[in-house]
């Protein structure tokens, strides 16, 4: 068994959801572009109250509009019931470099968001998918324009420029939205 990696070297790739059936299967929410691509990335780590623990997929399949999986560490539904909400992580250095103008969500979290009027709207605290497109949750800071939380679509018409070196995202998003 490999030793637990440093948490700062990890990237979140998904989350376990409610149990499916009686044999320890769980619904899996994937944060990968192709939701089944999550199963091509190994090894997985799960974040628990006692630290990072390995999680090994025994089997998986598409089920309706989602995906379910069975794990070596989860023998039955009773254990599966305790796993709802557990986050899934991989070591970032095993992932390929993103293509030009593509980003891993974990690289975007904590970036400062500025609009075209040069107003500081806040920092990205979360990226999530709605089905139509990804959304940036932008939280106010002590230095931001106001105390409003904003949900800004991650879309080519909205995101003007990303500068990972300067840790900023420029958006076409007026402050009164």
From Swiss-Prot:
Domain PRC barrel: 100-177
Domain of life: Bacteria
GO molecular function per UniProt: ribosome binding
Pfam families linked to this entry: PRC_RimM, RimM
Main localization category: cytoplasm
InterPro entries: PRC_barrel-like_sf (IPR011033), PRC_RimM (IPR056792), RimM (IPR011961), RimM_N (IPR002676), RimM_N_sf (IPR036976), Transl_B-barrel_sf (IPR009000)
GO CC aspect terms: cytoplasm; ribosome
Family: Belongs to the RimM family.
Domain remarks in the Swiss-Prot or TrEMBL record: The PRC barrel domain binds ribosomal protein uS19.
Subunit structure: Binds ribosomal protein uS19.
Protein name: Ribosome maturation factor RimM
Source organism: Psychrobacter cryohalolentis (strain ATCC BAA-1226 / DSM 17306 / VKM B-2378 / K5)
């Amino acid at each position: 068994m490999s030793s637990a990696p440093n948490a700062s070297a990890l990237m979140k790739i998904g989350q376990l959801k409610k149990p499916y059936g009686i044999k320890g299967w769980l619904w899996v929410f994937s944060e990968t572009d192709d939701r089944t691509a999550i199963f091509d990335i190994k090894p997985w780590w799960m974040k628990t109250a006692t630290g990072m623990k390995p999680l090994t997929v025994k089997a998986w399949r598409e089920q309706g509009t989602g995906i379910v999986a069975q794990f070596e560490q989860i023998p039955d539904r009773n254990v599966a019931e305790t796993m709802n909400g557990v986050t899934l992580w991989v070591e970032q250095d095993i992932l390929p470099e993103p293509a030009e103008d593509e980003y891993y969500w974990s690289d975007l979290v904590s970036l400062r968001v500025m609009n075209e009027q040069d107003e500081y709207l806040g920092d990205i605290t979360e990226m999530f998918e709605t089905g139509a497109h990804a959304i940036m949750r932008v939280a106010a800071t002590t230095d931001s324009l106001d105390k409003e939380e904003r949900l800004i679509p991650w879309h080519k018409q909205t995101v003007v420029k990303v500068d990972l070196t300067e840790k900023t995202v420029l958006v076409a998003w007026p402050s009164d939205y």
